[in-house]
Amino acid sequence: MVLIIDRLYEEVNKKGNVCVGLDTDLSYIPQRFLKNYENIEDAIFQFNRKIIDATHDAVACYKVQIAYYESFGLKGLMAYKRTLEYIKKVGCIAISDVKRGDISKTAEMYAKAHFEGDFETDFITVNPYMGMDSIEPYMPYLQNKEKGLFALVRTSNPGSKDFEYIQSGSGRRVYEIVGEKLERLGEKVMGQCGYSSIGGVVGCTTLEDGKEIRKNFGKTFFLIPGFGAQGGGAKEANVYLKDGNGGVVNSSRGILLAYKKYENGEKNFDECSRKEVLKMQKELGRE
């Protein structure tokens, strides 16, 4: 059976490692475009649609951060739903950045909420720091359907060192132990590509840690945030990749707000986003 991770691996082979983050704040939408819409739902969705139309042939996937949509209530969630549906319509892969983290029946309900029904998506992000019993309820969807997870391992925020870097009695850091347990569980959902449908979220803001993480977790496909606005660059991101694959590199504001770099960029903001994607591809070594 071909798993969702095999699809993502092939998308990277065909289109490169760029993941567009649709973390769409209302303030990101150009005023000349925003004034065409009477309600928030349409404004956000139509902005996203323009970005998707301009980039879907050049990106591996899209990451949709649900908080930006939840903040606008039901209209925002409708824009979220329509965005996921449109990503599917154009034949692309969606990662819903929801960072769920709970156990037992609650985790089962989270799985149902995001892998079925109105908010159905391909991958979701999860927080495993409550323990592996916060991951196991998702396994039936990974084993029986084309769904996947990206679990937080070593994040890109400065505060990650508050907990993730704490050393155990054996001298190993907490994030290393988490990554090891995730990779072990991931052996139950290995794709034909050699990677598991349980991926890891690893920030591209520290070069040396990145080299060790890639070396230690050879079967884990990475979602790599921190590029651009958070200070990470191609050098830091590339250490997580293996033969040009094995990860997708996310940029959100850098792509959504690319139009601000250009004179009269608001008029063709979607084309500016495409230029930024192609620039990012080149930086990551994809010509």
From Swiss-Prot:
Pathway: Pyrimidine metabolism; UMP biosynthesis via de novo pathway; UMP from orotate: step 2/2
EC identifiers of the protein: 4.1.1.23
Signal sequence range: none
Molecular functions per Gene Ontology: orotidine-5'-phosphate decarboxylase activity
SMART domains: OMPdecase
Catalytic activity: orotidine 5'-phosphate + H(+) = UMP + CO2
Entry keyword set: Decarboxylase, Lyase, Pyrimidine biosynthesis
GO BP annotations listed: 'de novo' pyrimidine nucleobase biosynthetic process; 'de novo' UMP biosynthetic process
Active site as annotated: 99
CDD domains in UniProt: OMP_decarboxylase_like (cd04725)
InterPro entries tied to this protein: Aldolase_TIM, OMPdecase_type-2, OMPdeCOase_dom, RibuloseP-bd_barrel
Superkingdom: Bacteria
Pfam families from the UniProt entry: OMPdecase
UniProt cross-references to PANTHER family, sorted A to Z: OROTIDINE 5'-PHOSPHATE DECARBOXYLASE
Database matches in NCBIfam families: pyrF_sub2
Family, similarity comment: Belongs to the OMP decarboxylase family. Type 2 subfamily.
Name of the molecule in the record: Orotidine 5'-phosphate decarboxylase
Organism: Clostridium novyi (strain NT)
Name of the encoding gene: pyrF
